[in-house]
Amino acid sequence: MADITDIKTILYTEKSLNLQEQGVVVIQTSPKMTKTGLKAVLKEYFGVTPKSINSLRMDGKVKRFRGRLGQRNDYKKFYVKLPEGVSLENTEA
């Protein structure tokens, strides 16, 4: 089952800040997280039931380090639409 430790961070980019005005929060998680798992974590730890969840899988970038090729970790990104007047900032985990 999914756990709160699978959530890496809430993303604060230009695009995600524009989406927050529409009630959408962008969450970065480990690749094994699923929509139903994220929904259960949000309900258990934050007390929030999302209206909808969209997900996409992001491959880690290939980078050079000391002349060798390496790869950053893969992750999943979730776009979570929250009910009106609810945000994850005013809830305590």
UniProtKB/Swiss-Prot annotation:
One matching Pfam family: Ribosomal_L23
GO cellular component, one term: ribosome
Keywords: Ribonucleoprotein, Ribosomal protein, RNA-binding, rRNA-binding
Disulphide bridges: none
GO molecular function: rRNA binding; structural constituent of ribosome
Any Gene Ontology biological process: translation
Task of the protein: One of the early assembly proteins it binds 23S rRNA. One of the proteins that surrounds the polypeptide exit tunnel on the outside of the ribosome. Forms the main docking site for trigger factor binding to the ribosome.
Subunit and partners: Part of the 50S ribosomal subunit. Contacts protein L29, and trigger factor when it is bound to the ribosome.
Family: Belongs to the universal ribosomal protein uL23 family.
Protein name: Large ribosomal subunit protein uL23
